[in-house]
């Protein structure tokens, strides 16, 4: 496989990278030589699997850092950006992947269970829309993006219980 990002000091900042599309993106980009920074929020019960997954990324001979934090908290975002300035040294973020999901699976109509309310939609819009804007703005203002950076955002229609 061609490692077109190898030795270029380019990074992927992946928000929500401990599972699903975020993790798959991290693995694929690492295979192509891109350094990886994953922001995640997981429980201890998922820690062993996550460590195995993260180990696979480091086996691609790329730089790797991870932060277990709430990506939706402005003060945590600010702390992470300051940490990245040091961690990346003179490297830049080539791609920001927003793969965090927060919402609920309530139905719109039902006679037997609680249905969606306005605050449910506001929570989802904040987490999956405004959060993307806030992260892009913060990374841009910190001058951490490369000149030809990309932003990728995944959304979800949810899972079933």
What residues fall within each predicted segment?
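A glycine-rich helix->loop->beta "capping" turn
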Residues: 58-65, 80-99, 103-109, 117
């Amino acid at each position: 496989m061609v490692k077109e990002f190898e030795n270029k000091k380019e990074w992927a900042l992946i928000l929500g990278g401990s599972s699903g599309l975020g993790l798959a993106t991290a693995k694929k980009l690492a295979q192509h030589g891109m350094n990886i920074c994953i922001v995640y929020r997981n429980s201890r019960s998922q820690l062993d699997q996550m460590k195995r997954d993260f180990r696979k990324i480091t086996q691609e001979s790329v730089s790797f850092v991870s932060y277990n934090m709430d990506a939706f908290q402005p003060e945590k975002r600010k702390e992470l950006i300051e940490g990245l300035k040091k961690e990346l040294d003179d490297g830049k973020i080539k791609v920001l992947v927003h793969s965090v999901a927060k919402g609920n699976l309530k139905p719109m109509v039902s006679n037997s269970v609680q249905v969606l309310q306005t605050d449910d939609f506001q929570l989802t819009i904040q987490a999956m829309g405004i959060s993307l804007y806030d992260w892009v703005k913060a990374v841009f203002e910190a001058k951490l993006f490369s000149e030809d950076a990309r932003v990728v955002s995944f959304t979800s229609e949810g899972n079933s219980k």
